[in-house]
Amino acid sequence: MSENKKFRPKKVGNTEQVSEKQHTDTALNISQDNKTSSSSAKRGAKGRRGTKGKSGPANSSQTSNIEGSNALELEFDRDSQLSVLQELFPSWTIDDLSFALEEADRDLELTILHITEGHASKWGEVKKKPIPKTKSKPTSHAPVSDNVSSTFRNATRKSKKPSASKDTSRGVRKSKAGAPSDPSSVHAPSSLEKPAGTGDLPSSEISTKAPASTTVSSSVDPGTINEDSSMKDHTTSNEQASVLTSANTAASTNTNGTAGGTSASAKSTSAADQAVASSKPIKKAWASVAKSKKKVTPAPAPAPESEPSKPSIAPSQPSKTNVSAAYEKPAELSSSSVPFPHKSQDSATPANVETTPSTATSAPKKSTAPFAINAVKPAPGLSNISSASLPKPSFAKQAAVGSQSSTTSMTTARLLSDRFPVVMPVANTAAIPEKVQVRFGSLTLGGEDKKSTKSSSDNIAQSGPRSSYFPKKTVSPKPEAKKEASKVAESTKIPKKQHTSAYESRAPQSKVPENLKESHVNETPYRGLHDVNLPASGNASSVSAIPPQVSAQTTIPAASTSATSGPVVGKQSAGYGGIYSPATHGISPQPYAGASLIPPSTGAAFNNETASSNAGETTALPYSSRFMNPVENRSANSPFDNFQHIDHSTELGYASNTSQQYQQTSHPAYTTMSPIEYGQAAPAAHYYNERNQYSQYDNVAGSASNTPDVHSVMHNKVASSNATSLPAAGTATPSPVVSQQQPQPYAFPPMYPIPYVSYGYGTMPYNNNKFGQPQQGYMSQSGFNDFPPIFGGHSNVYNRQQPGNVSGMSGTQTSNPINNATANTSGMTEKAAGHRDSVIGNGGVTGANSMSSTLGGLSSMSGMGRAAPGMFMGNVGSFENLSANAASPYGLPPQQTPLTNAATQQTTSFQSNANKVNNANSQPAGFPFNSGASTNAGSNGLGGYNAYNQSFINRPGGWYGNA
């Protein structure tokens, strides 16, 4: 067996401790007897396998051959056993399992039982076995230390947090059979017990560091003593001392030789022990153990660090041991020697705990009792272990680390609270609660993040162990935590989303009149009549400068004189594509711009520069539109019946003009128009009986009467003769009346209706026209829409050209038939050569004079009568390029005739619209689309104005139908 023993240690005991234990004497000395005694002592608690140990002598008498064969078998058996153990306990290393197997005399079942019950410890763990049942609870120093150490070890094992050095733990295990006779093994617990039970040790000692040697000796020595002394009849005290020293060395991470290392580990251990003790001062076992244990002078404690913490903690006089002195010094280090700015970090700062992970818990300050740590409770099954015993397992690893981490790792940030000067290092062992809810100085037990959000009171309150003996990791928040939280709350506040379209950012936020507000009205008013940018020149008369005045009138204003305040432009209630557009159901207008969906050329037209009088500059042209997602048609709350009046000289385009004409919106002919949802089939006749009525009046000398010349444009008409409500004959209106373009009901998707936009005398592109009469354009959707263009033409353009020549008129206009308008095919007749109106009807317009646009039948002009309008659809161009198919600056192809290439000619070449008094009876009411009744309306020739339509193309999206 001696050979077998020799063979065994080589395999099993790679560590010094095992070899020391088994080979301290000759192989013969460490024969089966020793193993038997140790195994029996080890198993004393369990009472198993005693027979094998007893039969050791008989086995030793067997032949060496048998022993050799047994050794080989044991070796193979050990390998298989280790493999089984490793599968069962993957967290255990081979060395730990080998050692545990050795302790169980290579009994696999017993080894498993030891490990599962916590009686076997890993190399890094101090605790190894539960309290031997044979031994009484610590009435004497040795038994108490045994119980405490073993129970603590068990707790540690259960927590499965390995202590620092495995070597130490193994060495300790070998030596841990009996009650610790070695004072060094006892002294650490005693010092711990003293702080907890009696508070004899200075709190500084407790709080700072337990010398690594002390920690090891306390945790290991009990085990060592248990094995060696109880099982082995105590090896010589020197042997035990050496074992303890080696254990301490391992525990302190090979710092056993150095007093500093020992003191550091002792500090951490003592701090942990004392912290535990302080956490559970109530346990007398701790106190009794401390008292009973012999004073042992562990490795010389490191130079005492500043002891300010000492005074804060009612220093219980270090009881009789050098260990207490070692503890004192570590305590001094942790509490005061380490200069930590006492910031208002709560004393129970997890960071503090982390910094002193080597120590189990922080020692209580002066008022240790108030901070009694309820949290540190022995794991169930450790009932006999006093809270002081738990701190013991600040193991060699922790002790070694603690010696440095408690000093070096503890940074000034860790000690933030000057209210608690004493800081206890925290033990890393799982058995010890990571955080005891007691503050010592700015440090709390249980290493955690520096940033703690809980109050110190919470830390203290949370004394109960978490999940058996782990207290909740709570740290009192720094004083500024609340502020930070509030800041976070503020930052998390989500500001209400604001609509910031390019248009709105520029639009003056003028209020929408109450009469225009609908339940669906967008509360964000939109800028100005024309939806144009502010002129770069800052023209005060720009649209944005003075928002239009909105009138609630629902009838055409009464006749007035030329002294009226200025042009009045009627828009649909807040005007689609212009002015406010409040009734867009949340769809905000988006003006054309370079970044929009329309071509840059059209976007350029949006940039209005009134200061730029060059007719060739397309950027000087007002433009307004919005591309929006289609919205289903709405008929409710139609805004069509409202007038908007814009005072003279306050809006773009209305420079002083001779007659100060009014312009307003009236659409009585919409009575038969109803909205349909896109995709719906075209309705029956009369459904499209919509008409834009243009009534203009100019009180010019020589006029036969102050009656308006009423014209109406109908587009997309299904045969109907029921249009009604044109202004009564002889009713003079102070200005042209411009109706909104109605959306094409069968267009998919329905188009936004675009209002006529009129610009007066002296403004772009109406250069010095005689009276500055605004022109009205009626635009169709084009290929510039973000929906598939409908080139068939779904809208009409009506332009009135009146150079103001009041000469007699003669001649007759040829018939102007329009498809689907079968009831009114007689066309228009005029007796004055220059009296012309132009209707660009549906793509179905027929006639000798009809002309298709460049977009392929989008709209055609029929008849040359009443002055040729400027109809532009399609590509962009310039004023100078106005040939038949030239592109216009508005993105619209020009009407082919009678336009010329010279912009100047366009303002002068158009026939004048002479006074209609002479032919009032024979002149249908503006257009043949009316009921056919003659309009006794006469009008002086109005000032000529350019034949360019202000280009507003229909936009896809919702529209609101007719009132």
Swiss-Prot record:
Compositionally biased spans, kind Low complexity: 245-272, 306-316
A GO biological process held by the record: transcription-coupled nucleotide-excision repair
Modified sites of kind Phosphothreonine: 474
Disordered, as annotated region: 1-72, 119-417, 444-517
GO cellular component: chromosome, telomeric region; cytoplasm; cytosol; nucleus
Subcellular location(s) of the protein: Cytoplasm; Nucleus; Chromosome, Telomere
Location of Phosphoserine modifications: 476
Compositional bias of kind Polar residues: 25-34, 57-68, 204-221, 346-365, 401-414, 454-466
Basic and acidic residues bias spans: 119-128
GO molecular function, one term: ubiquitin binding
Stretches with biased composition (Basic residues): 43-52, 129-138
PROSITE patterns associated with the record: CUE
Its job: Recruits the ubiquitination machinery to RNA polymerase II for polyubiquitination, removal and degradation, when the transcription-coupled repair (TCR) factor rhp26 fails to efficiently displace stalled RNA polymerase II. Also involved in telomere length regulation. Binds DNA.
Complexes and interactors: Homodimer; may form higher order oligomers. Interacts with the large RNA polymerase II subunit RPO21; the interaction is direct and serves to bridge RPO21 to the Elongin complex in a manner dependent on transcription stress. Interacts with rhp26.
Family statement: Belongs to the DEF1 family.
Name of this protein: RNA polymerase II degradation factor 1
Gene: def1
